[in-house]
Design a protein with these regions (language model features):
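Elongated alpha-helical scaffolds
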Residues: 75, 222-250
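Short beta-strand segments and strand-loop junctions that repeat across beta-rich extracellular domains
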Residues: 79-83, 193-198, 334-341, 386-413, ...
C-alpha cells in the first residue's frame, strides 16, 4: 500500500518522538516554503579581494545620500568602516591628534621596535595610531615610520612601543620636530558580561587619565565591548559606541583657574592635544572657583587653545577673585560621532568638533545607544548623562537634541525642541528601535513606547509591559509594524500588546544559549523569505563570557514555523534595496546571502551540508510491524548550478527503522536520489522509485546534500508498505 508522507512544517524539538510523529525533528541550512522544506541559498563574498576587517563587527546599517548612492556602516570593536558600494573605507574617529616634541622616536640597535615618547598619551595595547612627518631614524626609513601601527606595549604614561618593518642600525633618538601622531579611539573587547560595560563605577564607571574607560589614579579598567549604534542624519551618519566615554583626567594640582573680574576660565592640561574652537565637556569640578558656580564651570565648553598645555573657555558670570581648583576635573570629548558624507575620506568626528555653524550646547558625552527620530529628525540619546552638568551618566535618562541642530541639547531654550525624560520602570535602558509611529524602548524589566506629541513635551512615554527581559541590545527587530525580540528564556513579539511567542524549539535554543554572552545576539530579517533570524552563541564553546556566535534560529512569520542551524554571523542586514541580505562573519569578511547554493567563504566554494530529519513516522498506527520495500521520492532540483552536463546533482534519502521510541534505530538504508539534467534542453528527469527492504513499526526520514551547486525542495514522498504481524 502506498502511503503519503506529508509532514507538518517546522522543526519541533520540544515534543517527544511519538508526540511529534508526522513532524520534523532536526535541520541545518533549510527553510520551509509553502509548508515544504528546501535548502537555503548559499553565500559569496561581496568583494573578492577584500582584506579582513580588523576587530569584530556587531552592527550593520545602510543608508543613501541625496544622489542615491548607497553606504553601509560596519563598525567593529577596533575600527569603524564604511562600504561605499565600491570599496571599504576606514573612517575610525580620533581621540587625540598632536605634534610631538622634537625627536620623540627612539631605536635600539638591530631591533625593529621603536619607542614613542608622548606625555599623557593615554594609549593602551592594541590601540591604533598613525605617525606622519617623521624623518629617517637610525636606519629605519621615514616610509617605514610614517604609517599606521598597533601599540605593542605601554612603558608608562609618557611612552609606548610599536613594531616597524625596518631594523635599526644603531641606538638613539630622532624623527625631527614635526612628528605628528593621530590616536584612534580605544580598542574594545570582543566579549563582556551582559550589560557589564562602562557603567560599573560609582557614576557610570570612573574616567581616567588614560582616556576612554580608565579610572583616575587606579589600575582597574571598565569594559567597552565594541557595540555601536548607528543611524543617518539626512545623508550624513551619526554613531555612538555603547557606554564609552572619551575622558581624560586633566591632572595636576588645581588645574582650573579664574582671574578676578574676568569670565575667562583657564585649564592647564599638559599635552592636551585638543584643537581650537571644539567643544569639550568639563566634568568633576566639585566646588565653585573664584565665585563662579559649578554649574558654569562644568558642562559643554567651546575652547580656545592657548598653547600645547592650556586652553580657556568662558562662563556667564565673572570671577569675584583670582583662584584655582578642580583637581578631580575631567575633560571629555562627546562620544557621539558624525561623518560628513561630502568628505568621504575624512574620519568621523565628535559632535563637539563640528564647525562654527553649530551651537554645541549641553552635549551628552556618553550614551547606551542613539537613534534619529524618523518623525522629528532629532538625535535621541538613551541611557546618557542628564542635562544637569553636575550629574553623572544615568542609564534611565533619554535626551534629544533640537530638530534643527544635532549639537544643541539645551532644554532650557524654549525656542528649541531639545528635551529630556527619565524612565520609571527598570534599572537601565538596554536598547530601542524605531517603529512606524513610535519608538520602542526596552529597560531591563519593561517595554516603553515613546511617541511624538509636539511642544513643549516633545515625546510621550507609556509602559506597555513589564516582567520580561531582552537578551541584548541587538536581539530585536521590527518587521512590518511588529517588533520581535529574544529574551534569556523566551521569544517575544509586540503588535500593540506583548506576547510570548509559541516556539517549538524553545528548549533546544535556551538550554544551550550562553546567557553571559547575550550582548552578541544579533537579530535581523530576510524579508524575501519572511524570516526573523537570531544569531546567538551556544554553550558548546569556551568559557561563559567569551563565546562567539555559532548558531541561528529562524521564525517564519508567514508560515508561523521555526527552524535552526549552525552558522557564525556577527551582524546581518536585510535586503533593503539590494538583491541579497548581507552579513559579516567572525572571519572578518562581508557576504551576500541567498547567492548561489554553496559556502563562498572558501576558494573554491565548498558544499553546504544541508539536511532535514523527521521524528518517528508510525506505519499503520504502529500496532503492527510492516515491511517497507519501495520509496517514491518527490524532490525537485530546480536551479541547481555548477555541475557539468555529465554529472548528477543528488541528495541522499535515508530511511531509519525503529520498533519503539526508546529502542535502537536500525542501520537504515541510504539511497541516492538523482536528477539527470541537460544544459541545452533544460530537461528534468526525476528518479522514479527506490527499492529497499526493512521491517519496523515506525521510520524516520532524513534528506541530506553535501555537494556543490545543489538546490533541492522536498515534496510529498510515498512509502510502499505491507503489514507483517505484531512482533
Amino acid at each position: 500500500m502506498l502511503t503519503k508522507i506529508q509532514l507538518k512544517p517546522g522543526i519541533n524539538r520540544d515534543a517527544t518522538n511519538y508526540a511529534n510523529s508526522g513532524g520534523w525533528f532536526d535541520s541545518n541550512f533549510i527553510r520551509f516554503r509553502n509548508g515544504l522544506p528546501e535548502k537555503i541559498g548559499g553565500w559569496t563574498r561581496i568583494y573578492a579581494n577584500q582584506t579582513a576587517l580588523i576587530g569584530q563587527c556587531r552592527k550593520m546599517y545602510d543608508w543613501s545620500n541625496l544622489a542615491g548612492n548607497q553606504y553601509l556602516a560596519i563598525p567593529t570593536n577596533v575600527k569603524f568602516y564604511v562600504d561605499d558600494s565600491s570599496s571599504i573605507i576606514d573612517i575610525s574617529p580620533l581621540r587625540r591628534n598632536l605634534t610631538l616634541a622634537s625627536n620623540p622616536i627612539a631605536t635600539s640597535n638591530t631591533s625593529s621596535t621603536i619607542t614613542i615618547t608622548d606625555v599623557n598619551h593615554g594609549g593602551t595595547v592594541g590601540d591604533y595610531i598613525t605617525i606622519s612627518g617623521a624623518t629617517n631614524v637610525n636606519g629605519i626609513t621615514a616610509a617605514q615610520i610614517n604609517k599606521e601601527f598597533v601599540i605593542q606595549s605601554v612603558i608608562n604614561t609618557s611612552a609606548y612601543t610599536v613594531t616597524t618593518t625596518g631594523t635599526a642600525t644603531s641606538t638613539g633618538s630622532g624623527g625631527g620636530s614635526v612628528v605628528n601622531v593621530s590616536y584612534q579611539f580605544h580598542k574594545g573587547t570582543t566579549s563582556a558580561s551582559a550589560f557589564s560595560g562602562w557603567g560599573s563605577g560609582p557614576w557610570g564607571g570612573s574616567i581616567g587619565q588614560y582616556g576612554w574607560g580608565y579610572g583616575p589614579g587606579t589600575t582597574f579598567t571598565t569594559f567597552y565591548n565594541g557595540l555601536w549604534s548607528v543611524d543617518n542624519y539626512g545623508e550624513d551618519m551619526v554613531a555612538c559606541p555603547r557606554d564609552l566615554t572619551n575622558g581624560t583626567l586633566i591632572g595636576g594640582v588645581n588645574p582650573v583657574s579664574t582671574s578676578n573680574t574676568s569670565n575667562v576660565v583657564t585649564v592647564t592640561q599638559v599635552n592636551h592635544g585638543l584643537a581650537n574652537n571644539i567643544a569639550v565637556v568639563i566634568y568633576g569640578v566639585e566646588s565653585p572657583i573664584g565665585g563662579i558656580p559649578i554649574t558654569q564651570l562644568n558642562g559643554t565648553k567651546i575652547i580656545s587653545v592657548a598653547n600645547a598645555n592650556a586652553y580657556t573657555y568662558t562662563t556667564a558670570n565673572v570671577a569675584t577673585s583670582t583662584a584655582s581648583g578642580g583637581s578631580s576635573a575631567i575633560s571629555i570629548q562627546p562620544s557621539i560621532i558624525y561623518w560628513d558624507i561630502t568628505d568621504p575620506n575624512g574620519p568621523a568626528v565628535s559632535l563637539g568638533e563640528l564647525g562654527a555653524a553649530y551651537e554645541k550646547k549641553y552635549l551628552p558625552y556618553v550614551a547606551v545607544e542613539i537613534m534619529v527620530s524618523d518623525q522629528n529628525r532629532q538625535i535621541i540619546a538613551f541611557g546618557c548623562n542628564p542635562y544637569d552638568v553636575t550629574k553623572p551618566q544615568d542609564k534611565m535618562v533619554i535626551r534629544w537634541c533640537d530638530s534643527s541642530d544635532p549639537t544643541n541639547w539645551d532644554i532650557a531654550d524654549t525656542t528649541k525642541t531639545a528635551g529630556e525624560q527619565r524612565l520609571s520602570s527598570g534599572s537601565y535602558i538596554v536598547t530601542a528601535v524605531q517603529n512606524r509611529e513610535e519608538i520602542l524602548v526596552w529597560t531591563d524589566t519593561s517595554l516603553f513606547t515613546m511617541t511624538p506629541v509636539g511642544p513643549p513635551y516633545g515625546y510621550g512615554f507609556n509602559v506597555v509591559g513589564s516582567n520580561f527581559d531582552i537578551a541584548g541590545p541587538n536581539s530585536k527587530v521590527v518587521a512590518g509594524s511588529i517588533a520581535y525580540w529574544m529574551g534569556t528564556n523566551n521569544f517575544y513579539m509586540y503588535d500593540g500588546k506583548i506576547t510570548a511567542m509559541p516556539c517549538t524549539v524553545r528548549d533546544y535554543v535556551f538550554l544551550d544559549f550562553s546567557v553571559d554572552d547575550g550582548e552578541k545576539v544579533y537579530c535581523s530579517s530576510d524579508s524575501g523569505n519572511n524570516e526573523i533570524i537570531w544569531f546567538y552563541p551556544s554553550q558548546s564553546q569556551g568559557p561563559a563570557g567569551s563565546r562567539e556566535v555559532d548558531k541561528y534560529v529562524v521564525y517564519n512569520y508567514i508560515e508561523e514555523v521555526w527552524y535552526y542551524g549552525n552558522l557564525s554571523r556577527t551582524a546581518w542586514i536585510d535586503r533593503r534595496g539590494h538583491s541579497n541580505p548581507r552579513a559579516v562573519s567572525d572571519d572578518g569578511y562581508l557576504y551576500n546571502h541567498e547567492s548561489g547554493y554553496d559556502d563562498g567563504s572558501t576558494s573554491p566554494a565548498s558544499a553546504i551540508n544541508a539536511y532535514i530529519e523527521s521524528s518517528a513516522i508510525e506505519i499503520e498506527n504502529g500496532d503492527h510491524f510492516s515491511f517497507v520495500d519501495r520509496v517514491i521520492p518527490d524532490i525537485t532540483f530546480r536551479n541547481s548550478t555548477t555541475h557539468p552536463i555529465d554529472a548528477q546533482p543528488s541528495v541522499t534519502f535515508t530511511i531509519k527503522p525503529q520498533d519503539y521510541p526508546g529502542s535502537q534505530i536500525g542501520a537504515g538504508n541510504a539511497r541516492p536520489v538523482t536528477r539527470n539534467s541537460s544544459a541545452t534542453l533544460n530537461v528534468n528527469r526525476f528518479t522514479n522509485q527506490l527499492f529497499t527492504r526493512l521491517r519496523a513499526r515506525s521510520v524516520a526520514l532524513r534528506l541530506e546534500s553535501n555537494e556543490t551547486g545543489v538546490s533541492w525542495r522536498l515534496g510529498i514522498p510515498r512509502l510502499d508498505t505491507r503489514k507483517d504481524g505484531r512482533r
